[in-house]
Amino acid sequence: LNTQKGDFYNAKSNIKVGFGVEITGISQLRDPFLDAQYRSQISKLGTTDAHAAGFEQLTPIFDEATMDGVRAAFISLTSSLSTLSTQVGNQEHDTMVRSNMQILLNLFRENSVKLQDVREDMQMGFEVTDIADLNSMLKNISELNTSIKNSQVLGNPALELQDQRNQLLDELGSYLPISVKYKNQEVGPGQYVEILNVDFTDTEGVKHSLISDGLYGQFDADVLNQPVQLTLFEAKGATSDVTEVLGSGTLKGTLDFLNKSGDFDGTDFKGLGYYEKVLDSLVNTLATKFNEANVVLDENGKPTNLLNEDGSVVESFDKDGKPIYAIDPQTGDLLDGNNGNAKVYAYPLFETSDGSTEFTAANIKIATGWSNGSYGIRPSNNYVTVDKDTGSTANENILNMVKLLEKDISFSAKNSAGKDITFYKGSFHDCFANIEATLGIDYKSANTMLANQISVLNETANSRDAVSGVQLDEEGMDLLHYNQSYSAAARFLTTLDEALDKLINGTGVVGR
Protein backbone atom coordinates (compact mmCIF):
# COMPACT_ATOMS: atom_id res chain seq x y z
CA LEU A 1 0.00 0.00 0.00
CA ASN A 2 1.08 3.52 -0.68
CA THR A 3 0.00 6.63 1.26
CA GLN A 4 0.28 10.03 -0.29
CA LYS A 5 0.61 13.55 1.18
CA GLY A 6 1.58 12.83 4.76
CA ASP A 7 1.28 9.87 7.09
CA PHE A 8 -0.94 8.78 9.91
CA TYR A 9 1.30 10.26 12.60
CA ASN A 10 1.94 13.72 11.20
CA ALA A 11 -0.92 15.12 9.20
CA LYS A 12 -2.70 18.45 9.22
CA SER A 13 -5.73 17.14 7.37
CA ASN A 14 -8.26 14.42 8.05
CA ILE A 15 -8.35 13.42 4.39
CA LYS A 16 -6.23 10.46 3.53
CA VAL A 17 -5.85 9.25 -0.04
CA GLY A 18 -4.44 5.68 -0.35
CA PHE A 19 -3.76 3.43 -3.29
CA GLY A 20 -4.48 -0.24 -2.61
CA VAL A 21 -4.20 -3.38 -4.79
CA GLU A 22 -7.00 -4.85 -6.88
CA ILE A 23 -6.53 -8.42 -8.17
CA THR A 24 -8.45 -9.03 -11.38
CA GLY A 25 -7.10 -12.53 -12.00
CA ILE A 26 -4.16 -14.93 -11.96
CA SER A 27 -2.85 -16.58 -15.11
CA GLN A 28 0.15 -18.55 -16.35
CA LEU A 29 2.95 -16.78 -18.14
CA ARG A 30 4.23 -19.04 -20.92
CA ASP A 31 5.91 -18.64 -24.30
CA PRO A 32 4.14 -20.88 -26.87
CA PHE A 33 7.20 -20.82 -29.16
CA LEU A 34 9.52 -22.09 -26.41
CA ASP A 35 6.99 -24.78 -25.45
CA ALA A 36 6.84 -25.99 -29.06
CA GLN A 37 10.64 -25.88 -29.35
CA TYR A 38 11.08 -27.85 -26.13
CA ARG A 39 8.65 -30.56 -27.23
CA SER A 40 10.31 -30.79 -30.64
CA GLN A 41 13.73 -31.23 -29.03
CA ILE A 42 12.56 -33.82 -26.51
CA SER A 43 10.98 -35.82 -29.34
CA LYS A 44 14.33 -36.00 -31.16
CA LEU A 45 16.03 -36.92 -27.90
CA GLY A 46 13.50 -39.74 -27.43
CA THR A 47 14.54 -41.29 -30.75
CA THR A 48 18.25 -41.21 -29.95
CA ASP A 49 17.70 -42.43 -26.39
CA ALA A 50 15.81 -45.49 -27.67
CA HIS A 51 18.60 -46.21 -30.18
CA ALA A 52 21.28 -45.92 -27.50
CA ALA A 53 19.30 -48.13 -25.10
CA GLY A 54 19.03 -50.83 -27.78
CA PHE A 55 22.74 -50.76 -28.61
CA GLU A 56 23.52 -50.95 -24.90
CA GLN A 57 21.69 -54.28 -24.71
CA LEU A 58 23.69 -55.63 -27.67
CA THR A 59 27.05 -54.59 -26.26
CA PRO A 60 27.44 -57.57 -23.85
CA ILE A 61 26.80 -59.96 -26.77
CA PHE A 62 29.43 -58.75 -29.23
CA ASP A 63 31.81 -56.65 -27.14
CA GLU A 64 34.45 -59.19 -26.11
CA ALA A 65 36.63 -57.17 -23.78
CA THR A 66 38.41 -60.35 -22.70
CA MET A 67 39.79 -63.00 -25.05
CA ASP A 68 37.50 -65.83 -24.06
CA GLY A 69 34.74 -65.62 -26.64
CA VAL A 70 34.26 -66.21 -30.36
CA ARG A 71 37.59 -64.71 -31.37
CA ALA A 72 39.44 -66.94 -28.90
CA ALA A 73 37.50 -69.96 -30.21
CA PHE A 74 38.66 -69.22 -33.77
CA ILE A 75 42.26 -69.05 -32.57
CA SER A 76 41.94 -72.39 -30.74
CA LEU A 77 40.32 -73.98 -33.80
CA THR A 78 43.17 -72.83 -36.05
CA SER A 79 45.72 -74.18 -33.59
CA SER A 80 44.05 -77.61 -33.33
CA LEU A 81 43.77 -77.91 -37.11
CA SER A 82 47.47 -77.09 -37.46
CA THR A 83 48.28 -79.80 -34.94
CA LEU A 84 46.06 -82.30 -36.77
CA SER A 85 47.93 -81.59 -40.02
CA THR A 86 51.08 -82.97 -38.40
CA GLN A 87 49.27 -85.95 -36.86
CA VAL A 88 47.28 -87.29 -39.80
CA GLY A 89 45.03 -90.18 -38.85
CA ASN A 90 45.26 -89.47 -35.13
CA GLN A 91 41.71 -89.82 -33.83
CA GLU A 92 42.52 -87.93 -30.65
CA HIS A 93 43.51 -84.79 -32.54
CA ASP A 94 40.45 -85.04 -34.80
CA THR A 95 38.35 -85.17 -31.63
CA MET A 96 40.16 -82.07 -30.37
CA VAL A 97 39.28 -80.22 -33.57
CA ARG A 98 35.66 -81.32 -33.21
CA SER A 99 35.61 -80.17 -29.56
CA ASN A 100 36.96 -76.73 -30.47
CA MET A 101 34.44 -76.50 -33.28
CA GLN A 102 31.66 -77.43 -30.85
CA ILE A 103 32.80 -74.66 -28.49
CA LEU A 104 32.59 -72.20 -31.37
CA LEU A 105 29.10 -73.38 -32.32
CA ASN A 106 27.98 -73.13 -28.68
CA LEU A 107 29.15 -69.52 -28.59
CA PHE A 108 27.28 -68.77 -31.81
CA ARG A 109 24.15 -70.42 -30.44
CA GLU A 110 24.49 -68.52 -27.15
CA ASN A 111 24.78 -65.23 -29.02
CA SER A 112 21.71 -66.14 -31.07
CA VAL A 113 19.73 -66.88 -27.90
CA LYS A 114 20.84 -63.58 -26.38
CA LEU A 115 19.78 -61.69 -29.50
CA GLN A 116 16.39 -63.36 -29.33
CA ASP A 117 16.13 -62.46 -25.64
CA VAL A 118 16.89 -58.82 -26.46
CA ARG A 119 14.19 -58.83 -29.12
CA GLU A 120 11.60 -60.40 -26.82
CA ASP A 121 12.47 -58.06 -23.93
CA MET A 122 12.21 -54.98 -26.13
CA GLN A 123 8.95 -56.16 -27.68
CA MET A 124 7.49 -56.80 -24.25
CA GLY A 125 8.71 -53.46 -22.94
CA PHE A 126 7.33 -51.69 -25.99
CA GLU A 127 3.87 -53.18 -25.55
CA VAL A 128 3.56 -53.37 -21.76
CA THR A 129 5.48 -50.24 -20.75
CA ASP A 130 5.76 -47.72 -23.58
CA ILE A 131 2.37 -48.17 -25.20
CA ALA A 132 0.58 -48.61 -21.85
CA ASP A 133 2.17 -45.45 -20.43
CA LEU A 134 1.39 -43.52 -23.60
CA ASN A 135 -2.27 -44.55 -23.60
CA SER A 136 -2.55 -43.70 -19.90
CA MET A 137 -1.00 -40.30 -20.59
CA LEU A 138 -3.48 -39.52 -23.37
CA LYS A 139 -6.37 -40.48 -21.09
CA ASN A 140 -5.07 -38.37 -18.19
CA ILE A 141 -4.61 -35.28 -20.37
CA SER A 142 -8.15 -35.68 -21.67
CA GLU A 143 -9.53 -35.95 -18.13
CA LEU A 144 -7.53 -32.89 -17.08
CA ASN A 145 -9.08 -30.98 -19.99
CA THR A 146 -12.52 -31.73 -18.60
CA SER A 147 -11.53 -30.81 -15.02
CA ILE A 148 -9.93 -27.54 -16.13
CA LYS A 149 -13.04 -26.55 -18.09
CA ASN A 150 -15.30 -27.31 -15.14
CA SER A 151 -13.13 -25.15 -12.86
CA GLN A 152 -13.02 -22.28 -15.35
CA VAL A 153 -16.80 -22.27 -15.58
CA LEU A 154 -16.85 -21.57 -11.82
CA GLY A 155 -14.32 -18.75 -12.21
CA ASN A 156 -11.33 -20.74 -11.00
CA PRO A 157 -8.35 -20.62 -13.43
CA ALA A 158 -7.22 -24.10 -12.24
CA LEU A 159 -3.55 -23.19 -12.51
CA GLU A 160 -2.40 -26.28 -10.61
CA LEU A 161 -4.30 -28.52 -13.02
CA GLN A 162 -2.79 -26.65 -15.95
CA ASP A 163 0.67 -27.25 -14.50
CA GLN A 164 -0.06 -30.98 -14.34
CA ARG A 165 -1.32 -30.95 -17.93
CA ASN A 166 1.73 -29.09 -19.21
CA GLN A 167 4.00 -31.62 -17.53
CA LEU A 168 2.12 -34.50 -19.18
CA LEU A 169 2.30 -32.74 -22.55
CA ASP A 170 6.08 -32.49 -22.19
CA GLU A 171 6.26 -36.23 -21.42
CA LEU A 172 3.96 -36.99 -24.35
CA GLY A 173 6.31 -35.04 -26.63
CA SER A 174 9.11 -37.50 -25.86
CA TYR A 175 7.10 -40.36 -27.43
CA LEU A 176 6.24 -38.72 -30.75
CA PRO A 177 6.25 -35.23 -32.32
CA ILE A 178 3.13 -33.35 -31.22
CA SER A 179 1.54 -29.98 -31.89
CA VAL A 180 -0.59 -28.38 -29.17
CA LYS A 181 -3.39 -25.93 -29.99
CA TYR A 182 -5.39 -23.83 -27.52
CA LYS A 183 -8.62 -22.00 -28.25
CA ASN A 184 -11.23 -20.22 -26.13
CA GLN A 185 -14.82 -21.40 -26.28
CA GLU A 186 -17.63 -19.12 -25.10
CA VAL A 187 -19.95 -20.84 -22.64
CA GLY A 188 -21.92 -17.75 -21.64
CA PRO A 189 -21.95 -13.97 -21.96
CA GLY A 190 -18.34 -12.94 -21.36
CA GLN A 191 -17.51 -16.39 -20.00
CA TYR A 192 -14.88 -18.49 -21.77
CA VAL A 193 -13.22 -21.85 -21.18
CA GLU A 194 -10.02 -23.21 -22.72
CA ILE A 195 -10.16 -26.05 -25.27
CA LEU A 196 -7.02 -28.13 -25.92
CA ASN A 197 -6.29 -30.17 -29.06
CA VAL A 198 -3.18 -32.31 -29.56
CA ASP A 199 -2.18 -33.65 -33.00
CA PHE A 200 0.85 -35.14 -34.64
CA THR A 201 1.83 -34.86 -38.29
CA ASP A 202 3.49 -37.91 -39.81
CA THR A 203 6.36 -37.98 -42.30
CA GLU A 204 3.88 -38.02 -45.19
CA GLY A 205 2.23 -34.79 -44.02
CA VAL A 206 -0.94 -36.42 -42.69
CA LYS A 207 -2.28 -34.96 -39.43
CA HIS A 208 -3.53 -37.41 -36.79
CA SER A 209 -5.72 -36.43 -33.83
CA LEU A 210 -4.41 -37.59 -30.45
CA ILE A 211 -6.58 -35.46 -28.13
CA SER A 212 -9.63 -33.39 -29.02
CA ASP A 213 -10.89 -31.68 -25.87
CA GLY A 214 -12.43 -34.55 -23.86
CA LEU A 215 -11.77 -37.21 -26.52
CA TYR A 216 -8.51 -39.10 -26.76
CA GLY A 217 -6.88 -41.66 -29.03
CA GLN A 218 -5.21 -44.95 -28.18
CA PHE A 219 -2.26 -46.91 -29.60
CA ASP A 220 -2.06 -50.67 -30.14
CA ALA A 221 1.12 -52.65 -30.86
CA ASP A 222 1.33 -56.06 -32.53
CA VAL A 223 4.61 -57.51 -31.27
CA LEU A 224 3.89 -61.16 -32.09
CA ASN A 225 4.77 -60.81 -35.77
CA GLN A 226 7.69 -59.31 -37.65
CA PRO A 227 7.93 -56.46 -38.26
CA VAL A 228 6.28 -54.99 -35.17
CA GLN A 229 3.19 -52.99 -36.17
CA LEU A 230 1.83 -49.86 -34.45
CA THR A 231 -1.79 -48.79 -34.96
CA LEU A 232 -3.38 -45.51 -33.82
CA PHE A 233 -7.09 -45.27 -33.05
CA GLU A 234 -7.48 -41.52 -33.34
CA ALA A 235 -9.51 -39.29 -31.04
CA LYS A 236 -11.89 -38.41 -33.87
CA GLY A 237 -12.50 -42.04 -34.86
CA ALA A 238 -10.04 -42.74 -37.68
CA THR A 239 -7.69 -45.74 -37.59
CA SER A 240 -4.15 -45.44 -38.97
CA ASP A 241 -1.09 -47.66 -39.30
CA VAL A 242 1.71 -45.36 -38.14
CA THR A 243 4.56 -47.89 -38.03
CA GLU A 244 6.54 -46.36 -40.90
CA VAL A 245 5.48 -42.70 -40.63
CA LEU A 246 6.70 -41.61 -37.20
CA GLY A 247 9.15 -38.74 -37.58
CA SER A 248 10.80 -38.89 -34.17
CA GLY A 249 10.25 -39.91 -30.55
CA THR A 250 10.70 -42.96 -28.37
CA LEU A 251 8.17 -44.93 -30.42
CA LYS A 252 10.13 -44.36 -33.62
CA GLY A 253 13.46 -45.18 -31.95
CA THR A 254 12.18 -48.48 -30.57
CA LEU A 255 10.51 -49.47 -33.84
CA ASP A 256 13.70 -48.61 -35.72
CA PHE A 257 15.68 -50.94 -33.49
CA LEU A 258 13.17 -53.78 -33.71
CA ASN A 259 12.28 -53.55 -37.41
CA LYS A 260 15.19 -52.12 -39.39
CA SER A 261 18.20 -53.97 -40.78
CA GLY A 262 20.22 -51.22 -42.46
CA ASP A 263 21.48 -52.14 -45.94
CA PHE A 264 19.58 -55.43 -45.87
CA ASP A 265 16.18 -53.72 -46.02
CA GLY A 266 17.19 -50.41 -47.59
CA THR A 267 16.83 -48.36 -44.41
CA ASP A 268 19.12 -45.82 -42.78
CA PHE A 269 19.50 -47.58 -39.43
CA LYS A 270 21.27 -50.79 -38.40
CA GLY A 271 18.81 -52.25 -35.94
CA LEU A 272 18.57 -55.62 -34.26
CA GLY A 273 17.81 -57.34 -37.57
CA TYR A 274 21.15 -56.22 -39.01
CA TYR A 275 23.15 -57.91 -36.26
CA GLU A 276 21.03 -61.06 -36.49
CA LYS A 277 21.65 -61.26 -40.23
CA VAL A 278 25.41 -60.67 -40.12
CA LEU A 279 25.86 -63.27 -37.37
CA ASP A 280 23.83 -65.83 -39.34
CA SER A 281 25.81 -64.98 -42.47
CA LEU A 282 29.08 -65.62 -40.65
CA VAL A 283 27.80 -69.00 -39.43
CA ASN A 284 26.34 -70.00 -42.81
CA THR A 285 29.55 -69.11 -44.64
CA LEU A 286 31.65 -71.05 -42.13
CA ALA A 287 29.49 -74.18 -42.40
CA THR A 288 29.19 -74.06 -46.18
CA LYS A 289 32.91 -73.53 -46.80
CA PHE A 290 34.00 -76.30 -44.43
CA ASN A 291 31.43 -78.74 -45.80
CA GLU A 292 32.72 -78.05 -49.30
CA ALA A 293 36.31 -78.50 -48.10
CA ASN A 294 35.57 -81.97 -46.70
CA VAL A 295 34.34 -83.36 -50.04
CA VAL A 296 36.31 -86.20 -51.67
CA LEU A 297 37.68 -85.39 -55.13
CA ASP A 298 38.79 -87.72 -57.89
CA GLU A 299 42.09 -87.67 -59.75
CA ASN A 300 40.77 -84.80 -61.89
CA GLY A 301 39.89 -82.68 -58.86
CA LYS A 302 36.17 -83.30 -59.26
CA PRO A 303 33.72 -84.42 -56.52
CA THR A 304 33.35 -88.17 -56.47
CA ASN A 305 31.30 -90.85 -54.72
CA LEU A 306 28.01 -89.89 -56.40
CA LEU A 307 25.79 -92.94 -55.92
CA ASN A 308 22.48 -94.15 -57.29
CA GLU A 309 19.75 -95.70 -55.12
CA ASP A 310 21.30 -99.13 -55.66
CA GLY A 311 24.72 -97.91 -54.58
CA SER A 312 26.25 -97.87 -58.05
CA VAL A 313 28.44 -94.95 -59.04
CA VAL A 314 26.79 -92.35 -61.24
CA GLU A 315 28.68 -91.49 -64.37
CA SER A 316 27.32 -88.18 -65.67
CA PHE A 317 28.68 -86.61 -68.83
CA ASP A 318 28.01 -83.47 -70.83
CA LYS A 319 27.63 -83.31 -74.64
CA ASP A 320 31.41 -83.44 -75.05
CA GLY A 321 31.68 -86.57 -72.94
CA LYS A 322 33.23 -84.80 -69.94
CA PRO A 323 32.09 -85.65 -66.40
CA ILE A 324 29.59 -83.22 -64.88
CA TYR A 325 30.18 -82.14 -61.29
CA ALA A 326 29.01 -79.08 -59.37
CA ILE A 327 28.45 -77.80 -55.87
CA ASP A 328 25.32 -75.86 -54.96
CA PRO A 329 26.64 -72.47 -53.74
CA GLN A 330 23.66 -72.03 -51.40
CA THR A 331 23.59 -75.38 -49.61
CA GLY A 332 27.05 -76.78 -50.26
CA ASP A 333 25.42 -79.98 -51.60
CA LEU A 334 26.99 -81.84 -54.50
CA LEU A 335 24.98 -81.74 -57.72
CA ASP A 336 25.04 -84.46 -60.34
CA GLY A 337 24.23 -84.66 -63.98
CA ASN A 338 21.65 -87.39 -63.58
CA ASN A 339 18.70 -85.00 -63.30
CA GLY A 340 19.07 -84.91 -59.56
CA ASN A 341 18.34 -88.61 -59.15
CA ALA A 342 21.71 -89.54 -57.73
CA LYS A 343 22.40 -89.62 -54.03
CA VAL A 344 25.47 -87.82 -52.78
CA TYR A 345 27.77 -89.67 -50.47
CA ALA A 346 29.74 -86.87 -48.82
CA TYR A 347 31.30 -86.10 -45.45
CA PRO A 348 29.58 -82.95 -44.14
CA LEU A 349 31.01 -81.50 -40.96
CA PHE A 350 27.87 -79.50 -40.17
CA GLU A 351 24.14 -79.87 -40.56
CA THR A 352 21.05 -78.01 -39.42
CA SER A 353 19.01 -79.07 -36.42
CA ASP A 354 15.71 -78.17 -38.10
CA GLY A 355 16.34 -79.78 -41.48
CA SER A 356 16.53 -76.49 -43.36
CA THR A 357 19.13 -75.80 -46.03
CA GLU A 358 20.25 -72.47 -44.57
CA PHE A 359 22.63 -72.47 -41.63
CA THR A 360 21.98 -69.98 -38.83
CA ALA A 361 23.52 -69.36 -35.44
CA ALA A 362 20.47 -71.02 -33.89
CA ASN A 363 20.24 -74.22 -35.98
CA ILE A 364 23.84 -75.19 -36.78
CA LYS A 365 25.23 -78.35 -35.22
CA ILE A 366 28.04 -80.85 -35.71
CA ALA A 367 27.04 -83.42 -38.35
CA THR A 368 25.89 -86.74 -36.94
CA GLY A 369 28.52 -88.69 -38.89
CA TRP A 370 31.37 -86.57 -37.56
CA SER A 371 29.90 -86.54 -34.06
CA ASN A 372 29.58 -90.34 -33.76
CA GLY A 373 32.98 -91.02 -35.31
CA SER A 374 31.74 -92.51 -38.59
CA TYR A 375 34.12 -90.18 -40.36
CA GLY A 376 36.26 -87.18 -39.59
CA ILE A 377 38.08 -84.38 -41.31
CA ARG A 378 39.46 -85.61 -44.61
CA PRO A 379 43.27 -85.27 -44.46
CA SER A 380 43.33 -85.27 -48.23
CA ASN A 381 40.37 -84.62 -50.46
CA ASN A 382 42.17 -86.26 -53.40
CA TYR A 383 41.24 -89.72 -54.60
CA VAL A 384 44.25 -91.89 -53.68
CA THR A 385 44.89 -95.59 -53.26
CA VAL A 386 45.74 -96.02 -49.60
CA ASP A 387 47.67 -98.96 -48.21
CA LYS A 388 45.59 -100.34 -45.37
CA ASP A 389 48.66 -101.05 -43.24
CA THR A 390 50.75 -97.93 -43.78
CA GLY A 391 47.92 -95.46 -44.38
CA SER A 392 48.59 -92.06 -45.91
CA THR A 393 50.35 -88.94 -44.64
CA ALA A 394 48.63 -86.64 -47.14
CA ASN A 395 47.43 -83.56 -45.29
CA GLU A 396 46.80 -80.89 -47.92
CA ASN A 397 43.07 -80.73 -47.12
CA ILE A 398 43.72 -79.96 -43.45
CA LEU A 399 46.19 -77.27 -44.47
CA ASN A 400 43.56 -75.90 -46.84
CA MET A 401 41.16 -75.64 -43.90
CA VAL A 402 43.75 -73.73 -41.89
CA LYS A 403 44.17 -71.36 -44.83
CA LEU A 404 40.40 -71.16 -45.15
CA LEU A 405 40.18 -69.74 -41.63
CA GLU A 406 42.76 -67.09 -42.50
CA LYS A 407 41.95 -66.16 -46.11
CA ASP A 408 39.72 -63.29 -47.21
CA ILE A 409 36.13 -64.35 -47.88
CA SER A 410 33.14 -62.25 -48.92
CA PHE A 411 30.33 -62.31 -46.37
CA SER A 412 26.84 -61.42 -47.53
CA ALA A 413 23.19 -61.66 -46.53
CA LYS A 414 20.02 -61.40 -48.56
CA ASN A 415 18.01 -58.19 -48.60
CA SER A 416 14.22 -57.97 -48.69
CA ALA A 417 14.30 -58.52 -52.48
CA GLY A 418 16.34 -61.72 -52.17
CA LYS A 419 19.55 -60.16 -53.47
CA ASP A 420 22.85 -60.89 -51.75
CA ILE A 421 24.36 -57.80 -50.12
CA THR A 422 28.05 -58.07 -49.23
CA PHE A 423 28.79 -56.41 -45.90
CA TYR A 424 32.39 -57.50 -45.30
CA LYS A 425 35.39 -59.15 -46.93
CA GLY A 426 38.03 -60.75 -44.74
CA SER A 427 38.68 -63.77 -42.52
CA PHE A 428 36.15 -65.38 -40.20
CA HIS A 429 37.93 -63.97 -37.16
CA ASP A 430 38.03 -60.48 -38.68
CA CYS A 431 34.38 -60.69 -39.71
CA PHE A 432 33.30 -61.15 -36.11
CA ALA A 433 35.66 -58.34 -35.06
CA ASN A 434 34.03 -56.15 -37.71
CA ILE A 435 30.58 -56.85 -36.24
CA GLU A 436 31.92 -55.83 -32.85
CA ALA A 437 33.49 -52.65 -34.28
CA THR A 438 30.31 -51.71 -36.16
CA LEU A 439 28.29 -52.01 -32.95
CA GLY A 440 30.86 -49.95 -31.06
CA ILE A 441 30.71 -47.16 -33.65
CA ASP A 442 26.89 -47.16 -33.66
CA TYR A 443 26.75 -47.12 -29.85
CA LYS A 444 29.28 -44.31 -29.50
CA SER A 445 27.58 -42.26 -32.20
CA ALA A 446 24.20 -42.62 -30.49
CA ASN A 447 25.63 -41.63 -27.10
CA THR A 448 27.42 -38.60 -28.56
CA MET A 449 24.26 -37.44 -30.29
CA LEU A 450 22.29 -38.07 -27.09
CA ALA A 451 24.66 -35.88 -25.04
CA ASN A 452 24.39 -33.07 -27.61
CA GLN A 453 20.61 -33.24 -27.66
CA ILE A 454 20.43 -33.20 -23.86
CA SER A 455 22.56 -30.04 -23.87
CA VAL A 456 20.29 -28.34 -26.41
CA LEU A 457 17.19 -29.45 -24.49
CA ASN A 458 18.57 -28.02 -21.23
CA GLU A 459 19.22 -24.66 -22.92
CA THR A 460 15.65 -24.59 -24.19
CA ALA A 461 14.36 -25.55 -20.73
CA ASN A 462 16.37 -22.71 -19.15
CA SER A 463 14.95 -20.22 -21.65
CA ARG A 464 11.45 -21.45 -20.91
CA ASP A 465 11.97 -21.25 -17.15
CA ALA A 466 13.21 -17.68 -17.54
CA VAL A 467 9.74 -16.80 -18.82
CA SER A 468 7.39 -19.02 -16.85
CA GLY A 469 9.50 -20.16 -13.92
CA VAL A 470 10.97 -18.54 -10.83
CA GLN A 471 13.71 -15.99 -11.55
CA LEU A 472 16.37 -16.77 -8.97
CA ASP A 473 18.13 -13.39 -9.31
CA GLU A 474 14.88 -11.56 -8.71
CA GLU A 475 14.04 -13.76 -5.74
CA GLY A 476 17.50 -13.10 -4.28
CA MET A 477 17.07 -9.34 -4.62
CA ASP A 478 13.66 -9.55 -2.95
CA LEU A 479 15.22 -11.44 -0.04
CA LEU A 480 17.85 -8.71 0.37
CA HIS A 481 15.16 -6.03 0.29
CA TYR A 482 13.16 -7.92 2.89
CA ASN A 483 16.22 -8.26 5.10
CA GLN A 484 16.92 -4.54 4.88
CA SER A 485 13.29 -3.69 5.63
CA TYR A 486 13.27 -6.08 8.56
CA SER A 487 16.47 -4.55 9.99
CA ALA A 488 15.07 -1.03 9.63
CA ALA A 489 11.80 -2.00 11.32
CA ALA A 490 13.68 -3.70 14.16
CA ARG A 491 15.85 -0.61 14.67
CA PHE A 492 12.75 1.61 14.72
CA LEU A 493 11.13 -0.56 17.39
CA THR A 494 14.31 -0.50 19.48
CA THR A 495 14.45 3.31 19.32
CA LEU A 496 10.76 3.58 20.18
CA ASP A 497 11.24 1.22 23.12
CA GLU A 498 14.13 3.34 24.45
CA ALA A 499 12.06 6.54 24.11
CA LEU A 500 9.10 5.04 25.95
CA ASP A 501 11.39 3.74 28.67
CA LYS A 502 12.84 7.23 29.12
CA LEU A 503 9.40 8.82 29.26
CA ILE A 504 8.04 6.31 31.73
CA ASN A 505 10.97 5.79 34.01
CA GLY A 506 13.06 8.93 33.58
CA THR A 507 10.51 11.75 33.95
CA GLY A 508 8.32 12.99 36.86
CA VAL A 509 10.96 12.34 39.53
CA VAL A 510 11.53 16.00 40.58
CA GLY A 511 10.99 16.54 44.33
CA ARG A 512 11.28 12.94 45.28
Kindly label every feature range from the protein language model.
Residues 1-512:
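Structural signature of extracellular appendage/secretion-system components
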